[in-house]
């Protein structure tokens, strides 16, 4: 990457999630502390690669769209990642769909990418920058 790229990483505030739920069976051993640790590590990695990174941790839907919309109004992003917890957990599918449409309307210039777990965020972003 030759110039500093701006990246928005959208994911659930991990302390709001019930990792013991059957919906999280695909992520054995995951908990809020591990998610936050992985996000912070990937944030640091992306910064080391020259990216300007912002974490946008959202709730389970009550204010999520407003929080993301406010971020998009403040700044233009080159790449936006929506985390696997938002994207892959069936009970969050409608919120994921609403966020995609929000990004389409308010950040049409941004590349969209998706991680498969909290530890591969940097790789997902690098695919599109």
Give residue ranges: language-model regions:
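N-terminal, charge-rich interaction modules
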Residues: 1-25
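Short catalytic helix/loop segments, enriched in acidic residues and glycine
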Residues: 25-44
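Ser/Thr/Gly-rich flexible loops in soluble cytosolic domains mediating phosphotransfer, phosphorylation
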Residues: 38-39, 95-129
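Short beta->alpha junction loops
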Residues: 54-63, 115-117
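Mid-chain, well-packed structural core segment of small domains
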Residues: 65-101
